[in-house]
Protein backbone atom coordinates (compact mmCIF):
# COMPACT_ATOMS: atom_id res chain seq x y z
CA UNK A 1 0.00 0.00 0.00
CA UNK A 2 1.49 3.32 -1.04
CA UNK A 3 1.18 6.35 1.22
CA UNK A 4 1.94 9.64 -0.58
CA UNK A 5 2.38 11.75 2.57
CA UNK A 6 4.51 11.11 5.66
CA UNK A 7 2.44 9.94 8.62
CA UNK A 8 1.41 12.63 11.11
CA UNK A 9 1.59 12.12 14.87
CA UNK A 10 -1.91 10.62 15.04
CA UNK A 11 -0.96 8.03 12.41
CA UNK A 12 2.32 7.32 14.23
CA UNK A 13 0.31 6.64 17.40
CA UNK A 14 -1.90 4.23 15.42
CA UNK A 15 1.14 2.35 14.12
CA UNK A 16 3.36 2.19 17.20
CA UNK A 17 2.31 0.88 20.62
CA UNK A 18 4.78 3.21 22.37
CA UNK A 19 3.57 6.15 24.45
CA UNK A 20 5.19 8.83 26.60
CA UNK A 21 7.86 8.60 27.87
CA UNK A 22 8.90 5.89 25.43
CA UNK A 23 7.62 7.25 22.11
CA UNK A 24 10.89 8.48 20.57
CA UNK A 25 9.72 9.78 17.17
CA UNK A 26 8.24 13.27 17.07
CA UNK A 27 7.76 13.71 13.34
CA UNK A 28 8.38 12.03 10.00
CA UNK A 29 10.07 14.29 7.45
CA UNK A 30 10.45 11.97 4.43
CA UNK A 31 9.47 8.43 3.72
CA UNK A 32 8.75 5.78 1.16
CA UNK A 33 6.60 3.14 2.87
CA UNK A 34 8.44 -0.15 3.22
CA UNK A 35 11.72 1.32 1.93
CA UNK A 36 13.03 4.46 3.65
CA UNK A 37 12.23 6.94 6.41
CA UNK A 38 13.69 10.16 7.76
CA UNK A 39 12.24 11.33 11.07
CA UNK A 40 13.30 13.27 14.12
CA UNK A 41 13.21 13.33 17.89
CA UNK A 42 13.58 16.66 19.68
CA UNK A 43 15.71 15.93 22.73
CA UNK A 44 14.55 17.99 25.71
CA UNK A 45 16.03 18.39 29.19
CA UNK A 46 12.54 17.35 30.36
CA UNK A 47 13.11 13.75 29.21
CA UNK A 48 12.77 11.49 32.28
CA UNK A 49 15.98 9.58 31.53
CA UNK A 50 18.09 12.72 32.08
CA UNK A 51 17.27 12.59 35.80
CA UNK A 52 19.69 9.70 36.18
CA UNK A 53 21.79 9.72 32.99
CA UNK A 54 23.76 11.63 34.20
CA UNK A 55 23.01 14.22 36.91
CA UNK A 56 24.90 17.39 36.04
CA UNK A 57 26.02 15.90 32.69
CA UNK A 58 22.88 14.86 30.77
CA UNK A 59 23.54 12.44 27.90
CA UNK A 60 20.87 10.51 25.97
CA UNK A 61 21.44 6.78 26.57
CA UNK A 62 22.72 5.00 23.47
CA UNK A 63 20.10 2.28 23.81
CA UNK A 64 17.41 4.95 23.46
CA UNK A 65 19.04 6.25 20.28
CA UNK A 66 18.83 2.67 18.98
CA UNK A 67 15.20 2.48 20.09
CA UNK A 68 14.42 5.74 18.27
CA UNK A 69 15.99 4.32 15.10
CA UNK A 70 13.97 1.10 15.54
CA UNK A 71 10.72 3.01 16.01
CA UNK A 72 11.44 4.98 12.83
CA UNK A 73 12.13 1.79 10.91
CA UNK A 74 8.97 0.28 12.35
CA UNK A 75 6.91 3.17 11.04
CA UNK A 76 8.10 2.67 7.46
CA UNK A 77 7.49 -1.08 7.58
CA UNK A 78 4.08 -0.76 9.23
CA UNK A 79 3.01 1.99 6.80
CA UNK A 80 3.39 -0.54 3.99
CA UNK A 81 0.42 -2.55 5.37
CA UNK A 82 -3.27 -1.62 5.43
CA UNK A 83 -4.07 -0.73 9.06
CA UNK A 84 -6.65 -3.55 9.35
CA UNK A 85 -3.93 -6.13 8.57
CA UNK A 86 -1.96 -4.96 11.62
CA UNK A 87 -4.67 -5.90 14.13
CA UNK A 88 -3.30 -8.50 16.54
CA UNK A 89 0.29 -8.02 15.31
CA UNK A 90 3.37 -6.73 17.12
CA UNK A 91 6.66 -5.53 15.61
CA UNK A 92 9.73 -6.48 17.68
CA UNK A 93 13.52 -6.21 17.72
CA UNK A 94 15.11 -9.44 16.48
CA UNK A 95 18.75 -8.36 16.26
CA UNK A 96 21.27 -5.54 16.30
CA UNK A 97 24.59 -5.57 14.42
CA UNK A 98 27.53 -3.22 13.88
CA UNK A 99 26.42 -0.63 16.44
CA UNK A 100 28.65 2.44 16.66
CA UNK A 101 28.13 5.50 18.84
CA UNK A 102 30.19 8.39 17.51
CA UNK A 103 29.04 11.43 19.49
CA UNK A 104 26.94 12.25 22.55
CA UNK A 105 23.35 13.44 22.21
CA UNK A 106 22.43 16.11 24.75
CA UNK A 107 19.41 18.26 25.66
CA UNK A 108 18.55 20.74 22.92
CA UNK A 109 19.69 18.44 20.11
CA UNK A 110 17.41 17.43 17.28
CA UNK A 111 18.11 13.77 16.59
CA UNK A 112 17.57 13.03 12.89
CA UNK A 113 16.77 9.36 12.28
CA UNK A 114 17.23 7.65 8.92
CA UNK A 115 16.45 4.01 8.17
CA UNK A 116 16.55 2.14 4.90
CA UNK A 117 15.12 -1.36 4.52
CA UNK A 118 17.94 -3.45 3.05
CA UNK A 119 16.28 -6.87 3.20
CA UNK A 120 12.82 -8.30 3.73
CA UNK A 121 12.06 -12.00 3.92
CA UNK A 122 8.80 -13.41 5.24
CA UNK A 123 8.17 -11.61 8.55
CA UNK A 124 11.75 -10.31 9.03
CA UNK A 125 13.13 -6.91 8.03
CA UNK A 126 16.76 -5.79 8.10
CA UNK A 127 17.38 -2.04 8.21
CA UNK A 128 20.44 0.16 7.89
CA UNK A 129 19.90 3.03 10.33
CA UNK A 130 21.79 6.20 11.18
CA UNK A 131 21.21 9.03 13.64
CA UNK A 132 22.52 12.57 13.08
CA UNK A 133 22.77 15.81 15.05
CA UNK A 134 23.66 18.97 13.09
CA UNK A 135 24.50 16.81 10.04
CA UNK A 136 27.06 14.82 12.07
CA UNK A 137 26.68 11.07 12.39
CA UNK A 138 26.12 10.24 16.07
CA UNK A 139 25.12 6.57 15.83
CA UNK A 140 24.62 3.81 13.31
CA UNK A 141 23.47 0.20 13.34
CA UNK A 142 21.99 -2.61 11.33
CA UNK A 143 18.68 -3.53 12.96
CA UNK A 144 16.57 -6.63 12.39
CA UNK A 145 12.90 -6.65 13.32
CA UNK A 146 10.16 -9.25 13.15
CA UNK A 147 6.41 -9.11 12.98
CA UNK A 148 4.49 -11.70 14.95
CA UNK A 149 1.05 -12.30 16.37
CA UNK A 150 0.46 -10.75 19.80
CA UNK A 151 -0.65 -14.11 21.19
CA UNK A 152 2.86 -15.45 20.39
CA UNK A 153 4.41 -12.58 22.32
UniProtKB/Swiss-Prot annotation:
Q: Which InterPro entries match?
A: FabA_FabZ (IPR013114), FabZ (IPR010084), HotDog_dom_sf (IPR029069)
Q: Which GO terms describe its cellular component?
A: cytoplasm; membrane
Q: Which reaction does it catalyse?
A: a (3R)-hydroxyacyl-[ACP] = a (2E)-enoyl-[ACP] + H2O
Keyword Nuclease in record: no
Q: Which domain of life is it from?
A: Bacteria
Q: Which GO terms describe its biological process?
A: fatty acid biosynthetic process; lipid A biosynthetic process
Which EC number(s) does the record attach to this protein?
Answer: 4.2.1.59
| Keyword terms, alphabetized | Cytoplasm, Lipid A biosynthesis, Lipid biosynthesis, Lipid metabolism, Lyase
Enzymatic class: lyase
Q: Where in the cell is it found?
A: Cytoplasm
**Catalytic site residues?**
53
Which segments of the protein form a coiled coil according to its record? none
Alphabetized CDD domains for the sequence = FabZ
**Which SUPFAM superfamilies does the record match to this protein?**
Thioesterase/thiol ester dehydrase-isomerase (SSF54637)
Q: Name one GO molecular function term.
A: (3R)-hydroxyacyl-[acyl-carrier-protein] dehydratase activity
Would the keyword DNA damage turn up in this protein's UniProt record?
Answer: no
Q: Which NCBIfam families match?
A: fabZ, PRK00006.1
Q: Which family does it belong to?
A: Belongs to the thioester dehydratase family. FabZ subfamily.
Q: What does this protein do?
A: Involved in unsaturated fatty acids biosynthesis. Catalyzes the dehydration of short chain beta-hydroxyacyl-ACPs and long chain saturated and unsaturated beta-hydroxyacyl-ACPs.
Q: What is this protein called?
A: 3-hydroxyacyl-[acyl-carrier-protein] dehydratase FabZ
Give the organism the record lists: Lawsonia intracellularis (strain PHE/MN1-00)
